[in-house]
Design a protein with these regions (language model features):
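Conserved N-terminal structural module of periplasmic/extracytoplasmic solute-binding proteins
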Residues: 11, 21-97, 284, 392, ...
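Extracytoplasmic/periplasmic substrate-binding proteins
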Residues: 39, 49, 224-305
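Extracytoplasmic "Venus flytrap"/periplasmic binding protein-like
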Residues: 52-120, 129, 151-154, 247-249, ...
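A structural signal for short loop-to-beta-strand junctions that line the ligand-binding cleft
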Residues: 85-88, 117-150, 179, 287-288, ...
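Hinge/lid segment of periplasmic solute-binding proteins
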Residues: 94-143, 161-167, 174, 278, ...
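Long, aromatic- and glycine/proline-rich binding clefts that accommodate carbohydrate-like moieties
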Residues: 128, 278, 327-382, 406-408
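Extracytoplasmic/periplasmic solute-binding protein
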Residues: 135-139, 144, 164-211, 255
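Glycine-centered hinge/linker elements that transmit conformational signals in sensory
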Residues: 167, 208-239
Length: 409
């Protein structure tokens, strides 16, 4: 009911105006006092954004900030909204958007949905939507890349087959030496192989929970191709679940290449290893498609200042502020025109992640995606460690996921 009332109030201020001009027409509520949640590494940027917002528009909005991880921000909005003070604007990862919307915790984007649809990458616009409506304001994206030791691999790997060949004379499990590491059991990292030949998690671009594609012939073909990489990665995936173990071995020079994301760059810099970063190599001539994670600013449906909150969230997604965020935090904006500017003099890691971003798919944001992770981890373990036939492992995972979805309906 509250959501409907807020939407009516906002729309009354925007009637008959094109969506991009709506934000310019709305004025924040008198005495607006906004609470902003973002992760700790982004707090300095967010404080700058708030000052810039007031300065650019002549507002006198009060702001307070709290460092909160995106997954915790979404959980708090769901659990505490309506019973305790929650953020007016929070930043979350897009795969949590569906749960948040279903729980009634997020307002629609009522000021700039058309601008976002026409400006941002398709992955980002899809990530900002749920059930055909726009909720999120995209502010950055991340995906996986290949980090490699330049002392061990002087030439940047272009194919996984090159890494397999290197591993023939390098691998030594007793000495914890491996040509390649990644978190095998983590579907976020291994999905690039399941989708190698065109398979998908959910149909209709990740929105149809009744069309589960993880056991299709194409998915089976992809996972069989992944098993080739045992020759490069003979590690025990259970032992390598801990990211610090994998990254530590890479930093010690015992691992030639590791699949990781931009969140690991600072640690690799501190390790002193001479490393390079490239997009994910091809396997059997196919370009793997990684998951991308889109960071969204969302407006709480419980905000007492919905106009001010919508305006600030919109400001965070403006090209000016996306570029400033990149300059302050290295967070890559999901806008092609900005990526073209950044890539001209980008460092190696940023270049690789931008390049891989064009071969990535936004994680499905429907709530049913949450039922996929554990069964897929078990399926990957069964086929990789226990050598269970791929079709059996994937069929079993699909049956479990379908049961869980049916139970929730």
């Amino acid at each position: 009911m509250r959501n409907t009332w807020i939407k009516t109030v906002l729309l009354s201020a925007c009637v008959s105006l094109p969506l991009w001009s709506q934000a310019e027409d709305i004025q924040p509520e008198a005495g607006s006092d906004l609470l902003i949640w973002t992760d700790s590494s982004t707090l300095d940027y967010m404080k700058y954004a708030a000052e810039s917002f007031n300065r650019d528009f002549g507002y006198d909005i009060k702001f307070s900030f709290r460092g909160l991880a995106p997954i915790d921000a979404a959980s708090r909005l769901i659990q505490d909204g309506g019973s305790a003070r929650v953020a007016d604007v929070a930043e979350i990862e897009h795969d949590l958007l569906g749960r948040l919307v279903v729980a009634g915790g997020a307002m629609e984007n009522l000021v700039s949905s058309e601008r976002i649809l026409s400006t941002f990458l398709p992955n980002a616009t899809a990530a900002a939507q749920y059930a055909g409506s726009n909720y999120g304001f995209p502010v950055s994206y991340a995906t996986l890349a290949l980090f490699y030791n330049k002392e061990l691999l002087p030439a940047a790997p272009k194919t996984f087959e090159e890494i397999i060949q290197f591993g023939n004379g390098f691998n030594d499990a007793k000495a914890n030496r491996y040509a390649l590491l990644w978190d095998i059991q983590n579907y976020y990292e291994s999905r690039m192989f399941l989708t190698l030949y065109g398979a998908y998690e959910f149909g209709n671009q990740g929105t149809d929970a009744k069309d589960l594609g993880i056991d299709s012939p194409l998915a089976q073909q992809g996972m069989n191709a992944m098993k080739m990489l045992k020759a490069a990665n003979p590690s025990n995936p259970v032992d390598m679940r801990n990211a610090q173990v994998r990254r530590g071995l890479f930093g010690e020079g015992k691992v030639a290449a590791i699949i990781d994301g931009p969140w690991a760059i600072q640690g690799y810099d501190n390790s002193g290893v001479n490393y390079g970063v490239v997009p994910i190599p091809t396997l059997k001539g196919k370009q793997p498609r990684t998951f991308s994670t889109v960071r969204l600013a969302v407006v709480s449906s419980y905000s007492e200042y919905p106009k001010a909150s919508q305006l600030f969230a919109d400001y965070l997604s403006s090209e000016k502020m996306l570029l400033k965020r990149y300059q302050m935090t290295k967070s890559i904006p999901p806008v092609e025109s900005l990526m073209e500017k950044i890539i001209v003099d980008a460092d190696e890691a940023t270049y690789a992640i931008i390049a891989q971003g064009f071969h990535s798919d936004a994680m499905p944001s429907i709530p049913e995606m949450g039922y996929l992770w554990s069964p897929m981890a078990s399926a990957i373990t069964a086929m990789w460690v226990n050598d269970q036939p791929v079709n059996q492992a994937l069929d079993h995972a699909k049956s479990i996921i379908e049961e869980q979805i049916a139970y929730q309906e």
